[in-house]
């Protein structure tokens, strides 16, 4: 697979000098989530949707914040998370003219039930930090080698690790140098939309400013288009200012909306057990939110694309999918198709 225009062919201690990339080639991606090997028709379906890049998420596992050990099993888990799945999907993507993005995540065991999240990972003890950073380096370097092997165009070096990113900037600088010694593609980090992306100290060592774009847009029930457009205004201003100051384009490393009533107020919120089988889908708000995003943000000069969350490899018909982030089989899918195909 061919890499993008800005392959990093630089000495190991250098950083990109200007990563403002040709905006006529937007990254139009979805995160593919497949328990089993998807049918041969899956990637052609995404190409017809206008997708240019397929994003695959891999996992490392921590038992808790207090335990700095990171475990990984790249040959187990879901098909799309495995090394073999990445190899096979990248080969099919390449045959279709599609590109691949690898986006490793840490799964913090039980965090959804115990109130823990990966942005809080951090330690008062230096030895604990060193253990975590050693394990994280092993984790990321595995996927740096895999990304180089399969010709992935972009590698996301971290996702929503706010405390580490803020307190341990030198670790991330050193990790970037190490990754670039084995991987020639483009790099970004996926920073949370709140309390993180404007405070990252190593953006200039990366090719994109990566943002998990779950911005609150309106707390009103049944918001109008005007309300949602106004909701984007403050975020657009901040993103534009940061992009201009750092001379880096922005990539929305995640952007998605559920088809539920409060999607504009709490776009990050996952389906709860209480909703399953009781809440009614609101397909209109999901389609509306995507439409406003494309109208208000998509053509901004600082934006280089978005990774939409998410697309199931095998169509799930459970209520969790009906109330989840996927636009598959919902009116939002047609909104995405219209904008993605018109951008090419």
Spans of features found by a protein language model:
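Aromatic- and glycine-enriched glycan-recognition loops and surfaces
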Residues: 33-48, 71-95, 138
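Aromatic-lined carbohydrate-recognition surfaces of secreted/lumenal glycan-active proteins
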Residues: 103-106, 156-160, 164-166, 173-198, ...
């Amino acid at each position: 697979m061919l890499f993008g225009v800005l392959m990093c062919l630089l000495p190991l201690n250098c950083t990109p000098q200007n990563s403002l990339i040709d905006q006529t080639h937007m990254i139009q991606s979805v995160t593919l989530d497949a328990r089993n090997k998807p049918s041969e028709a899956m990637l052609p379906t995404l190409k017809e949707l206008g997708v240019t890049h397929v994003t695959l998420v891999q996992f490392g596992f921590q038992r808790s914040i207090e335990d700095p050990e990171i475990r990984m099993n790249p040959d187990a888990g879901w098909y799309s998370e495995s090394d073999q799945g990445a190899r096979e999907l990248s080969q099919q993507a390449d045959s279709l003219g599609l590109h691949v993005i690898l986006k490793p995540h840490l799964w913090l065991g039980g965090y959804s039930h115990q109130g823990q999240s990966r942005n809080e990972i951090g330690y008062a003890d230096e030895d604990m930090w060193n253990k975590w950073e050693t394990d994280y380096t092993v984790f990321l370097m595995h996927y740096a080698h895999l990304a180089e092997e399969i010709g992935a165009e972009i590698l996301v070096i971290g996702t929503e690790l706010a405390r580490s990113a803020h307190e341990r900037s030198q670790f991330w600088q050193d990790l970037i140098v190490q990754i670039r010694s084995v991987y020639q593609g483009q790099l970004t980090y996926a920073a949370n939309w709140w309390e993180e992306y404007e405070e990252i100290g190593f953006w200039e060592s990366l090719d994109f400013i990566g943002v998990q774009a779950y911005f609150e847009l309106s707390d009103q029930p049944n918001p109008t288009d005007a309300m949602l457009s106004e909701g984007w205004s403050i975020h657009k201003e901040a993103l534009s200012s940061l992009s201009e100051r750092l001379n880096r384009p922005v990539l929305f490393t995640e952007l998605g909306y559920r088809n539920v009533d409060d999607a504009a107020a709490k776009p990050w919120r996952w389906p709860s057990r209480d909703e399953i089988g009781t809440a009614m889908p609101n397909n209109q708000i999901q389609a509306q939110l995507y439409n406003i995003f494309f109208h208000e943000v998509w053509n901004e000069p600082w934006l280089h694309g978005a990774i939409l969350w998410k697309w199931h490899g095998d169509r799930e018909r459970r209520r969790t999918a009906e109330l989840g982030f996927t636009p598959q089989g919902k009116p939002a899918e047609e909104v995405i198709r219209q904008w993605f195909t018109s951008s090419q």
